């Protein structure tokens, strides 16, 4: 009983949605009780109700809230108003979040559950698995035991608007993009929860965004690849240039890396989809940022991308900087201070005064050689 948002182009006022998105809600009918797994964004509440009416749903006993974020919980007040007597089933932490976000909810609207607790619908049973920090601290998953269907909310999701939830034509790219943008900071926690998912052996995985996975082994195999510590012989160059100096440096670096056998991708930060960068960060061994000094600091666009790099906590092994300046150089210092989460190695950065000259170009070539040597040292070349 989902709602498809064909027109939404931005999530959290940050993440581009080139393919739109969907908010997946699932209705389960047992012999004695009924349940609704998650709701939809409040802008799409009426679509949810239209779908429930189409199924002639007259009564809902339980509304499962796997996650408090409003794209899944925002219709809760309207749902319990439409279906008097319906109880919101969630964990204690999520209950607190929901009451913060929607003050009209009160304690009497809730049933709280603990890890592995079950609720019977008669001939069907819901079991709950707490999964803190698989995105948010209150996240949980719901398992329909008899049918072996897992409802993991954002886990295994994808931002894509499609007319058929079983359409797997472009699942890989949308799933990787979603993982990269939203789930990758929690990579180590996801490793543990992958073990939980394998232990219950679902026949189907039904996330709260995007495609339903009728072949769980496929998407779980992708996640296994993305969460492991291995990186690839791949360097991404992130540059911003006001008067072509940093562009020249970035292009020369890209050519030098390619000549030394390092697969390379160049991003002009003045016009970039951050989702594409996030996807590349899942695999890249090396990241190099090229940015000029602006008002005694790093260019703000470069600073914002470096901030995101730090927040995403990628498994990148090597990082370096090329910074431009004329009368004062402060970009390097400010950018280097913005990556406390980076646990890899900083390759000696460079400073370029004005347009890159012969000595600068030679130093850039030496940086490319250093990157290639580092890649060889970890056996990816």
Predicted ranges, named:
Residues 1, 6-11, 147-166:
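Short, solvent-exposed beta-strand-terminating loops
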Residues 1-33:
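Zn-dependent metallo-beta-lactamase
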Residues 37-39, 60-68, 88-91, 150-154, ...:
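Active-site neighborhood of phospho(di)ester-bond hydrolases with catalytic His/Asp-centered motifs
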Residues 43-89:
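Active-site metal-binding motif and surrounding structural segment of the metallo-beta-lactamase
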Residues 75, 273-277:
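Short acidic active-site motifs
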Residues 89-139, 186, 192:
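Metallo-beta-lactamase
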Residues 162-165, 170-205, 210-211, 252-265, ...:
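FMN-binding flavodoxin-like domain, especially the glycine-rich phosphate-binding loop
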Residues 238-260:
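Short, charged N-terminal beta->alpha structural module
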């Amino acid at each position: 009983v989902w709602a498809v948002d064909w027109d939404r182009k931005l999530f959290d006022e940050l993440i581009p949605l080139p393919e739109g998105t969907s908010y997946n809600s699932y209705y389960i009918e047992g012999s004695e009780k009924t349940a609704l797994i998650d709701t939809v964004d409040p802008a799409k509440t009426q679509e949810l109700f239209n779908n429930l009416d189409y199924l002639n749903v007259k009564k809902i006993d339980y509304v499962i809230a796997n996650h408090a974020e409003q794209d899944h919980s925002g219709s809760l007040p309207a749902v319990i108003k439409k279906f008097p007597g319906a109880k919101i089933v969630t964990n204690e932490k999520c209950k607190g979040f929901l009451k913060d976000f929607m003050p009209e909810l009160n304690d009497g609207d809730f049933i709280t559950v603990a890890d592995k607790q079950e609720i019977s619908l008669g001939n069907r049973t819901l079991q709950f698995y707490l999964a803190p920090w698989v995105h948010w601290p209150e996240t949980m998953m719901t398992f329909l035991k008899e049918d072996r269907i897992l409802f993991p909310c954002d886990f295994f999701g994808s931002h894509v608007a499609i007319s058929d939830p079983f359409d797997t034509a472009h699942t890989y790219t949308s799933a990787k993009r979603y993982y990269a943008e939203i789930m990758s900071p929690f990579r180590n926690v996801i490793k543990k929860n992958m073990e939980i998912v394998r232990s219950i052996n679902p026949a189907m995985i039904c996330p709260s965004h995007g495609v339903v996975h009728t072949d769980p082994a496929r998407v779980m195999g992708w996640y296994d690849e993305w969460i492991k510590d291995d990186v690839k012989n791949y360097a991404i160059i992130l540059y911003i240039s006001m008067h072509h100096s940093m562009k020249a440096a970035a292009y020369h670096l890209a050519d030098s890396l390619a000549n030394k056998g390092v697969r390379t991708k160049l991003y002009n930060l003045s016009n970039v989809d951050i989702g594409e960068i996030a996807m590349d960060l899942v695999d890249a061994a090396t990241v190099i940022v090229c940015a000029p000094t602006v008002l005694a600091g790093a260019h703000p666009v470069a600073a914002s991308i470096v901030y995101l790099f730090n927040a995403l906590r990628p498994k990148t092994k090597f990082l370096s900087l090329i910074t431009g300046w004329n009368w004062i150089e402060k970009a390097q210092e400010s950018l280097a201070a913005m990556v406390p989460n980076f646990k890899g190695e900083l390759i000696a950065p460079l400073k370029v005064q004005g347009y890159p000259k012969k000595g600068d170009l030679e130093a850039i070539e030496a940086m490319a050689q250093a990157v290639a040597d580092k890649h060889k040292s970890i056996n990816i070349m």
